[in-house]
């Protein structure tokens, strides 16, 4: 079955990629979850739109990715969140909040979907955060969550 990915699926591809998958995987998982659409001639226009949007926010080349990695590695990112007396947060820290904290700390603008968090951040402390800037470049920085 030929499908067009609308979201990044690990081990399969990026948005806009046309891939061949087994019928059951496509019909029972990818299509109902919204990860893909069925391939048709009319869907070619949608593929073009997805690829255009991806290229607009993608880091262009390896050199630029390494430059952004250098900016992130030396960055001290602190995020203030509401917490109770025991240090447990009211809710959890989202990827969008982390991206905003990086921007506020003087870092580059990042895509929240490329963040790789070790687990849900639900308490005050220091956490390692990784971000995949390019297929060959991954940057890491420490996020400090403080009561605020």
Curated annotation (Swiss-Prot):
GO terms for cellular component: ribonucleoprotein complex; ribosome. Keywords: Ribonucleoprotein, Ribosomal protein, RNA-binding, rRNA-binding. GO terms for molecular function: rRNA binding; structural constituent of ribosome. It comes from the Bacteria. InterPro entries: Ribosomal_bL9, Ribosomal_bL9/RNase_H1_N, Ribosomal_bL9_bac/chp, Ribosomal_bL9_C, Ribosomal_bL9_C_sf, Ribosomal_bL9_N, Ribosomal_bL9_N_sf. GO terms for biological process: translation. SUPFAM superfamilies: L9 N-domain-like, Ribosomal protein L9 C-domain. PANTHER family: 50S RIBOSOMAL PROTEIN L9 (PTHR21368). HAMAP family: Ribosomal_bL9. Binds to the 23S rRNA. Belongs to the bacterial ribosomal protein bL9 family. This is Large ribosomal subunit protein bL9. The gene is rplI.
């Amino acid at each position: 079955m030929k499908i067009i990915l609308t979201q990044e699926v690990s081990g399969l591809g990026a948005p806009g990629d046309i891939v061949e998958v087994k019928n059951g995987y496509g019909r029972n998982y990818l299509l109902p979850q919204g990860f893909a659409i069925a391939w048709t001639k009319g869907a070619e226009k949608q593929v073009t739109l997805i690829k255009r949007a991806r290229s607009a926010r993608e880091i262009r080349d390896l050199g630029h990715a390494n430059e952004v990695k250098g900016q992130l590695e030396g960055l001290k990112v602190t995020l203030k969140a509401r917490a109770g007396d025991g240090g447990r947060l009211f809710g959890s820290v989202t990827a969008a909040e982390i991206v905003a904290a990086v921007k506020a700390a003087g870092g580059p603008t990042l895509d929240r979907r490329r963040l790789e968090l070790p687990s849900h951040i639900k308490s005050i402390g220091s956490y390692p955060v990784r971000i995949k800037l390019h297929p060959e470049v991954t940057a890491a920085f420490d996020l400090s969550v403080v009561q605020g």
